[in-house]
A protein has these predicted regions:
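Extended, Lys/Arg-enriched charged tracts that mediate electrostatic binding to polyanionic substrates
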Residues: 115-126, 130
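Short, charge-rich binding segments
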Residues: 112-118, 138-140
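Intrinsically disordered, low-complexity linker/loop segments enriched in Gly/Pro
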Residues: 109, 131-132
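Helix-start/capping segments and mature chain N-termini
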Residues: 1-102, 106, 135-340
Length: 340
């Protein structure tokens, strides 16, 4: 029985659900973990997460398919990425298989919060890990919590995705050889000033450039870029300081194996921006957000696809990946994980 929620008017924000998952790391090992009902986290004031930002997270969705199943999309890649993030911040990896089993457990427990099929909504699943014991000197914590919260969210774009205006920026999202390739809370904190400034100037997002030379495209504060050339190729930026987006990897596969497109994953110079036919941002929340204009220090670049609608090739990519996620198009093996 679904909760008494107005699914048609559900926003993209936090709604507390009944259960969350908790596992604790202490004395060099993880406990068995399990579901809890308390949504509050109580920690010592000197916990590593507070003092030195030792926290990482993931994001994925659970949703109903047309035939009444609840599924998730490629959670194995979220598990791998969380492990990679943990290693970089000197945090313990989870026991093998724990991530997916925990996701299944918490989604099943909160299945009444999974929006009905056809509303464009989903149950957002947020796994995260943090250092929890008191740490006054700069060093890794000794104790950790791995938690998963869930919250029902409406469609990222109500009424469909309309092209947005973005800008290039001299702010840096990540340093060379830094933490840009992992999903750490500190990366997102660094982007808050820049995104607030962008919004104040009338832009939806920042296009970060490489910190060393300011000549190559990186990503935004929370999404990878995709570019469509005038001859129909999909191009995605390559850099060691870009977060390896699961949505971007999936779109590259869809482009090549479902739509027969040529795909290039390579460094993208800023001088190329004026030559692309379509530009978009990709990520878990919106799948693809089309870009219609890029403001640069040399002037505005008007993307040929325009400011009215998503470009035709971007739309095919969007519709195909969405169809795969919702089991309306046959998925590659292992992409769809059934919860219940």
């Amino acid at each position: 029985m679904s909760k008494n929620i107005d699914w048609d008017n559900l926003g993209f924000g936090y709604v507390e659900t009944d259960y969350r998952y908790l596992s604790t790391y202490k004395d060099g090992k993880w406990d068995e973990g399990g579901l809890i009902t308390d949504s509050n986290v109580v920690l010592n004031e000197c916990a590593g997460v507070f003092q030195y930002a030792q926290t990482i997270f993931e994001g994925l969705k659970a949703y109903y398919t047309k035939d009444g199943r609840i599924v998730c999309f490629r959670p194995d890649l979220n598990a791998i990425r969380l492990d990679e993030s943990a290693e970089r911040l000197v945090m313990p990896k989870l026991p093998e298989g724990r991530f997916i089993e925990a996701v299944k457990e918490v989604v099943k427990a909160n299945k009444d919060f999974v929006p009905p099929y056809g509303h464009g909504a989903s149950l957002y699943v947020r796994p995260y890990m943090m250092g929890t014991n008191s740490v006054i000197g700069v060093k890794p914590a000794d104790e950790y919590q791995f938690r998963i919260l869930t919250t029902p969210v409406g469609p990222y774009f109500k009424g469909g995705a309309k092209p947005i205006k973005i800008r290039t920026t001299d702010f840096d999202r990540a340093a060379p050889h830094g933490t840009g390739h992992i999903k750490a809370g500190l990366n997102y904190a660094m982007s808050l000033y820049a995104i607030t400034d962008a919004h104040n100037q009338g832009y939806a997002e920042n296009m970060y450039l490489d910190a060393a030379t300011r000549t190559h495209v990186e990503e935004t504060g929370g999404a990878n870029f995709i570019f469509i050339t005038k001859d129909g190729k999909l191009v995605t930026p390559k850099s060691d300081s870009i977060l390896p987006s699961i949505t971007r990897r999936s779109l590259m596969y869809v482009a090549e194996h479902y739509l027969g497109m040529k795909v290039e994953h390579r460094p993208v110079h800023v001088d190329e921006l004026k030559d692309f036919a379509e530009i978009g941002l990709c990520g878990t929340a919106a799948v693809i957000s089309p870009v219609g204009l890029i403001h640069t220090k040399d002037g505005d670049i008007h993307v040929p696809a325009g400011m009215d609608d998503m470009g035709p090739i971007t739309k095919k990519l969007y519709d195909t990946l969405l169809g795969i996620q919702h089991c309306e198009i046959e998925a590659p093996e292992g992409w769809i994980v059934e919860i219940c």
